[in-house]
Amino acid sequence: MGLGPVFLLLAGIFPFAPPGAAAEPHSLRYNLTVLSWDGSVQSGFLTEVHLDGQPFLRCDRQKCRAKPQGQWAEDVLGNKTWDRETRDLTGNGKDLRMTLAHIKDQKEGLHSLQEIRVCEIHEDNSTRSSQHFYYDGELFLSQNLETKEWTMPQSSRAQTLAMNVRNFLKEDAMKTKTHYHAMHADCLQELRRYLKSGVVLRRTVPPMVNVTRSEASEGNITVTCRASGFYPWNITLSWRQDGVSLSHDTQQWGDVLPDGNGTYQTWVATRICQGEEQRFTCYMEHSGNHSTHPVPSGKVLVLQSHWQTFHVSAVAAAAIFVIIIFYVRCCKKKTSAAEGPELVSLQVLDQHPVGTSDHRDATQLGFQPLMSDLGSTGSTEGA
C-alpha cells in the first residue's frame, strides 16, 4: 500500500550550540529517515546533510538525486560531488530500510526510523564521530564510531529496540566491523575533502538590524530589535538603557533560526515607558563588530519580512489543513466509510540523545514544513 504524499515536520535541521571560547569544530552531519506503513517498509527515504551547520545536500525521493542547498555550495563543488553523494546516500537509505524491516514490535499505522551520523574535526585536528538511532522520534541507541561503544536510554522500550537493532547489525560481525570503520573513515574523508575545496571557509556576513515599536498601551510600548541575514549564527543582541544593558528578565529573545539561504535571523524585545524612547538602544555584536540602534520616534509602519510572511502563511495553512482533516474524519465516522488516511502527518524529532556525550550539537530546534513523496510505490522488496 502506497502512502501517497506525506507531510513531514522535520526538526533539528540546523544544529546550534552556545558560543564558547574555543573555535567551533568543522562538522558533517547526515540525517536519514525511512518509513513503514502497517509493517511494510516503504521504498522512499529522506536525507538531509549539513556542513558546518548549513544545509548542504537533500535527497527526498525514491530515485535520489543529491542537490546542493544554496548557491554557496553550488558555486564551489561540481557534478562529481553530487554523483558521489547520491550513490552513497542511496546505499545508506537501503541499509536503513533493511534495519527498519528487522524491528519486531512494529504496530499498525505509520512508523519512522531515523539515523543521524555526525563527524567533527576540531582545531587541534582531533576527530569525533557518532551515530544515533530514533524510532518514532524517540532515541533508543547511540554509538561512538571511534571507540565502538554503544549507549542507550534506560526505558525498557528503548532497550528492547536497541537490542533488536544491535542483534541485526551483529549477524555478520566482520561485515559490521568493516561497515562502521568505513562509515567513520568515509565521513571524515568527505569532510576533509570539503574543507580542502574551500566550500566551508569561515566567511562572515554582517546582519541587517531593524528596530520597530508597537502602539502605546497603558503608557508602555514594546520595542523589537531584529537581526537578519548574518553568518555565522552566534550573535549578541540586547537592549540598553542609557548605555547599560537591561536585566535578563526584562528582555525576551527569539531563537536563532535559519533564513533559508545559509544565513540566520533572531530578535530581542522589551517593554519601555512611552516618552523615554531616546534612552534606549539595541546593541548588536557579531564576529568582532558591534553597533547600536536607536528606537524610532513616532508611529512606524512595520513591514513584514519574507520570513514573517512565510511564517504567518504557514500557520494559516496549517490551521486550514487541521480543520479540513477534522471535517473529513467527522464525515467518515458518520458514514462508516473510513478506510485509512490518505494524508499522514509525521513528526520526526531530532532530539538530544540521552546517555551519550558524542552528540552535542542540537540544543535549539526549529520546525520546517516539508512535503515529500516518500513511499509512493509501496514497500520495498528485500527492503
UniProtKB/Swiss-Prot annotation:
Changing residue 179 to L: In allele MICA*012, allele MICA*032 and allele MICA*043. It is a single-pass type I membrane protein. Its main location: membrane. SMART domains: IGc1 (SM00407). Induction: By heat shock, by infection with human cytomegalovirus (HCMV), human adenovirus 5, M.tuberculosis and diarrheagenic E.coli, and by exposure to DNA damaging conditions such as high doses of ionizing radiation, chromatin-modifying treatments and inhibitors of DNA replication. The HCMV UL142 protein causes down-regulation of the full-length protein but not of the truncated MICA*008 allele. One of its GO terms (molecular function) is receptor ligand activity. Pfam families: C1-set (PF07654), MHC_I (PF00129). N-glycosylated. Glycosylation is not essential for interaction with KLRK1/NKG2D but enhances complex formation. Proteolytically cleaved and released from the cell surface of tumor cells which impairs KLRK1/NKG2D expression and T-cell activation. SUPFAM superfamilies: Immunoglobulin, MHC antigen-recognition domain. Widely expressed with the exception of the central nervous system where it is absent. Expressed predominantly in gastric epithelium and also in monocytes, keratinocytes, endothelial cells, fibroblasts and in the outer layer of Hassal's corpuscles within the medulla of normal thymus. In skin, expressed mainly in the keratin layers, basal cells, ducts and follicles. Also expressed in many, but not all, epithelial tumors of lung, breast, kidney, ovary, prostate and colon. In thyomas, overexpressed in cortical and medullar epithelial cells. PROSITE patterns: IG_LIKE. Changing residue 196 to E: In allele MICA*004, allele MICA*006, allele MICA*008, allele MICA*009, allele MICA*010, allele MICA*013, allele MICA*014, allele MICA*016, allele MICA*019, allele MICA*022, allele MICA*024, allele MICA*027, allele MICA*028, allele MICA*033, allele MICA*036, allele MICA*044, allele MICA*048, allele MICA*049, allele MICA*053, allele MICA*054 and allele MICA*056. Changing residue 274 to R: In allele MICA*005, allele MICA*008, allele MICA*010, allele MICA*013, allele MICA*016, allele MICA*019, allele MICA*022, allele MICA*027, allele MICA*033, allele MICA*035, allele MICA*037, allele MICA*039, allele MICA*042, allele MICA*045, allele MICA*048, allele MICA*053, allele MICA*054 and allele MICA*056. Recognized by antibodies in the sera of some organ transplant recipients and may be a target molecule in allograft rejection. It is linked to Anti-MICA antibodies and ligand shedding are involved in the progression of monoclonal gammopathy of undetermined significance (MGUS)to multiple myeloma. Widely expressed membrane-bound protein which acts as a ligand to stimulate an activating receptor KLRK1/NKG2D, expressed on the surface of essentially all human natural killer (NK), gammadelta T and CD8 alphabeta T-cells. Up-regulated in stressed conditions, such as viral and bacterial infections or DNA damage response, serves as signal of cellular stress, and engagement of KLRK1/NKG2D by MICA triggers NK-cells resulting in a range of immune effector functions, such as cytotoxicity and cytokine production. This is MHC class I polypeptide-related sequence A. It comes from Homo sapiens (Human).
